[in-house]
Amino acid sequence: MIPAFPTKKISAQILFLLTLANLVLAQNVASPAAEKPTPKMTYLLVGRLFDATGDGVKENMVIAVEDERIKSVTSAADLKIPPGANVIDLSQATVLPGLIDCHTHLGSRADRYNEIYHFKDTPFSHAFAGVVNARKTLEAGFTSVRDVGSNPFLAVDLRNSINEGYLVGPRIVASGPAISITGGHGDLNNYSPYVQMMMFPEERDYKIADGADQIRHVIRGQVKYGVDVIKIISTGGVLSRGDSPGAPQYTLEELKVAAETAHMAGRKIAAHAHGTQGIKNAILAGIDSIEHASLIDDEGIRLAKEHGTYLVMDIYNDDYILNEAPKYGLPVENLDKERMVGRLQRENFRKAFQAGVKMAFGTDAGVYPHGDNAKQFFYMVKFGMTPAQAIRAATSSAADLIGRSKDVGTIEAGKFADIIAVNADPLSDVRALEHVDFVMKGGVIYKDARPSMAHAGAN
């Protein structure tokens, strides 16, 4: 028998949870800039523009922003700015589209590896973390993210609160909890059954699914509660207990049902998959993106290219897990699993990219501290990409994966004015993106840390 979704209990709990989080943290996280939107028409004087429509840079450009969208992108020589217009001087900076991270967990903290937190933390802990992490992410230059697993429906509520202007954060493409088999990477394993029954009785109703009928039921229930994207777990994981990263956890037929059900509901679907067979099963099933893809083999690379499947490979966080997570109580079992897959993942990233597989930027933020997302660019360049290719993976390619190319991902007329700037050249040193000086989202400035913050009027 398929359990019914506990609609009233969950909805009331989440509403109360987010309301409390918002009330407590509003004074601390609200951005002063968010209260002062730019005037109706604003002109950005741009020294160097990487618009992500190609790999080149345009110099001495002007971006005209009207309300929340880009009105025009023009050579400075071809545009006469009206006297007294509002002008933002970025003539000494490199300007880029707002960055996109396709694999985040906004409700997670990177200092919560000790299993004791399963018992100490409450849903409020995750809500507070989500509010803070959303702002950190935006101020790091990531104006859009895809959240692929925050329990229970935290990302949905964060998305709504940000869209309503009540909280500060990036645009969020939100999933519900990652869907898992019983005893899989998304389940709570190696505890007494009484722990599950007493402490997490509702969790199974909207994330644990065994067999085709339960998969359909859970996906439809998540769509009912407002998710933008579905996340399903195809193989074991690194940070879970009692499973192997290489082992498949859903059959090919079950994954086909998941993809069909998600697509029927107008949602894309992402699959957590480290293991070789689980990766190939997910590709053959019609899943839109493979998360991690650590142990992908040559056949998997060929299949991904043939099917146009995106790989989202989080090749930075291996360093954080091995060097920092032990301080926060990560068990030896999980460290051993990370040692098994982390280095292989990086070499397979190189092979997949060289083979021409579609790649989108995603970091697993929450495994490491939110706000450090841009540290992954260095590793993407180290393992085969040019800086321009790595940036496009986090802009135009990422926008394509999350289904938002009409609005974000490049700097072009008609798109949202999601614009960042750095006072260095990231095409020469991609680590410049670790220090974003200027962030605009939807025409509103949320960060301005340029050495010269003068907003001069036009001559």
Per-region residue spans from a language model:
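Acidic, glycine-enriched loop/beta-strand segments at the rims
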Residues: 31-33, 49-62, 75-76, 386-391, ...
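Histidine-rich, glycine-flanked metal-binding segment
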Residues: 49, 53-96
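Active-site gating loops and adjacent loop-to-helix segments of metal-dependent hydrolytic enzymes
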Residues: 108-126, 135, 182-204, 238-252, ...
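His/Asp/Glu-enriched, well-ordered alpha-helical/loop segment
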Residues: 118, 264, 268, 329-333, ...
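Divalent metal-dependent hydrolysis catalytic cores, especially in the metallo-beta-lactamase
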Residues: 129-155, 168-178, 227-240, 268, ...
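Alpha-helix-loop-beta-strand connector modules within alpha/beta enzyme cores
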Residues: 160, 164-178, 246-271, 308, ...
